[in-house]
A protein has these predicted regions:
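Short alpha-helix
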Residues: 194-215
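Soluble or luminal CAZymes and related metallo-dependent hydrolases
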Residues: 36-44, 69, 134, 138, ...
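Class I SAM-dependent methyltransferase Rossmann-like catalytic core
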Residues: 8-54
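Core SAM-dependent methyltransferase catalytic element
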Residues: 237-264
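Short glycine/proline- and acidic residue-enriched helix-loop micro-motifs
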Residues: 30-31, 187-197
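Conserved class I S-adenosyl-L-methionine
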Residues: 152-181
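Conserved SAM-binding loop
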Residues: 52-53, 58-163, 260-264
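Conserved S-adenosyl-L-methionine
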Residues: 215-232, 239-249
Length: 264
């Protein structure tokens, strides 16, 4: 997905290349960010692995993999999953066939993945992707698409209310109303990140609402409310509660990322 959070086979001591995802020179701040990103992602991965009872013998789909292989935090979940004994598939709207060479054992599938052509998937993992899929409706639909593939999904995303925006590397501006934030980004020449199609940051409240709505709509489509349900005063909002677990790692003093595991 279009993000400068890119990487290659992860290890905390891996050399960071001199250029970022868009071909620009990497600064010392970028190098620190990538090392910190790797540590935070490892925290989220360990939490995810524990929440699903280990990944050995399980089949995981990495949804929204980046084609980048130059940075230490890119596709790190894929490597860790393979090392821990999972069967891993990957899919992306970008060309990622070369990742099968980078990560032996990985199987790349066409995008968008057809659930009917996939083996049974235990969990879909989407790392730092949902903030890049578009507006609120598109983010809900993205979650629904993932829920159509597996009974549980895990999403990670930067926290909108961390004081630093890791995409633009600007502090605090992203706390403004979205329209004002985008207007300032355009003034600063950051037109790519000013487009909602490329970046829509989420808070925990935003993400919880999105996943709740996506699960509710998925359940409604699969099992419509009957007259008997209505007679009992039940609706989709009153059915079994959604099973949602959170991980909120911190960086530079506050929650930097959100990871949510959703079971339907």
């Amino acid at each position: 997905m279009p993000q400068p959070n890119s990487v290659s086979p992860p290890a905390a001591t891996h050399d960071v290349k001199a250029f970022d995802y868009f071909g620009d020179r990497i600064s010392w701040l970028d190098r620190l960010r990538m090392q910190a990103s790797l540590r935070v992602r490892r925290q989220m991965y360990d939490w995810f692995r524990d929440q699903i009872g280990g990944v050995a013998g399980k089949t995981i789909l990495d949804h929204g993999s980046t084609p980048d292989t130059e940075h230490i935090d890119s596709n790190c979940f894929i490597q860790w999953l393979i090392e821990d004994g999972a069967t891993v598939y990957a899919t992306s709207p970008e060309p990622i066939d070369h990742l099968e060479t980078v990560f032996p054992g990985l199987q790349v599938v066409a995008f968008p993945p057809d659930p009917q052509r996939l083996p049974p998937i235990d969990c879909v993992l989407s790392s730092a992707t949902i903030e890049h899929v578009g507006n609120d409706y598109q983010q809900v639909q993205y979650c629904r698409d993932l829920l159509a593939i597996a009974p549980q999904i895990c999403l990670t995303t930067p926290n909108r209310y961390h004081w630093l925006d890791f995409h633009t590397k600007l502090p605090l501006l992203h706390w403004l109303p979205r329209a004002a934030h985008r207007w300032i980004l355009r003034l600063l020449g950051l037109k790519f990140w000013a487009q909602e199609a490329n970046l829509r940051l989420l808070s925990k409240r935003d993400l919880h609402r999105i996943v709740s709505r996506s699960v509710t709509e998925t359940i409604a489509a699969a099992a419509p409310i009957t007259q008997a349900d209505l007679d009992r005063g039940r609706s989709h909002h009153h059915r079994d509660p959604i099973d949602v677990k959170w991980c909120e790692p911190k960086f530079l003093g506050c929650v930097s990322n959100l990871a949510v595991l959703v079971r339907r």
